[in-house]
Amino acid sequence: MTIAVIAVVGLFFLAMGIHAIAAPAILVRPFGIRLDQAVSRAEVRAVYGGFGLAMAAVLALAAFHPGSLRTGITVTVAAALGGMALGRLMSALLGDRTPFYPNWFYCFVESVAAAALLLTDYR
């Protein structure tokens, strides 16, 4: 089960990273973000693309190295996902109301993935 959770979350990050590198404007379109300048496309490629690919890489490493390395990686990636979900919640608390998709859909995905990663090493 641990490997399956790591693989699913890793594939999510891999897909996000590839999508952000290949088509940054399409990736952020559901959020109402326009990428009219090269610098804005570069930023999305870095933050979503590079980060997604890096998370996929460390999760692949975790899948093949049980023990403290795996635990450290899964806890760190879970913290990153939890931070994303927390940022969405803080935005709502500050008065920014959003529809379910995309904001709350991704908040749910991030929360579930974070919880699943945290539970992988705690049986």
Describe the function of each predicted region.
Residues 12-13, 53-57, 110-117:
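Hydrophobic cores of alpha-helical transmembrane segments in multi-pass inner/ER membrane proteins
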Residues 5-8, 47, 76, 105:
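Physicochemical signature of membrane-embedded alpha-helices that form the seven-helix bundle of GPCRs
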Residues 117-123:
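Juxtamembrane boundary at the C-terminal end of a transmembrane helix
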Residues 23-41, 91:
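Cytosolic, membrane-interface loops and tails of multi-pass inner-membrane proteins
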Residues 41-63, 79-80:
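Core segments of alpha-helical transmembrane spans in multipass integral membrane proteins
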Residues 35-49, 99-109:
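Juxtamembrane helix-loop boundaries in multi-pass membrane proteins
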Residues 3-20:
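N-terminal signal-anchor transmembrane alpha helix
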Residues 62-104:
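Transmembrane helix-loop-helix
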